[in-house]
Amino acid sequence: MYNEALFYQSNLIYKEKNMDINFSKEDIAFRDEVRDWLANDYPKHVKEKTDAGITISKEDLIDFHKALSKKGWMGYNWPVEYGGTGWSASKLYIFNKELGLAGCPPILPFGVGMVGPVIYTFGNDEQKERFLPDILNFDTWWCQGYSEPGSGSDLA
């Protein structure tokens, strides 16, 4: 009896705090567009490997990112004025959820998620023109290096 009461109480608390998400018609149409892209334009050789649990190669990862770029979705978290999608939070959620459900490889975060936003926020026009298109086209790879204190090139 005590366990049943706890279960009931915890469900009430959860339900009160659970967010009710109702997608707009525009969001549902976008979800369908993402699903269509996954069915028709997601590189088949990459999908076959990820579906089979086979590690993808660097070339596979490039093909996946290039396909996103061709669709104009590489800048999924960027403002429109810098070549991004300008998507709403619900579209970002749908995009990430559908790619995850399809078993897509992760989008490499360094260029599009870290370096690009710093450049379009703080860079001058020359830097924006030079670097942003290559990030969106996945023509340049970016990374961030770390080292431990006292063992070589300490970043601190």
Where are the predicted features?
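Short, Lys/Arg-enriched N-terminal segments with co-localized hydrophobic residues
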Residues: 7-18
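A non-catalytic, amphipathic alpha-helix used as a structural packing/dimerization or gating element
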Residues: 26-37
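Short, contiguous pre-domain boundary segments
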Residues: 19-22, 46-48
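Short helix-onset patch at the extreme N-terminus, typifying the N->h transition
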Residues: 7, 23-28
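Glycine-rich flavin
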Residues: 44-156
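N-terminal glycine-rich anion-binding loops that anchor highly charged ligand groups
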Residues: 36-40, 68-69
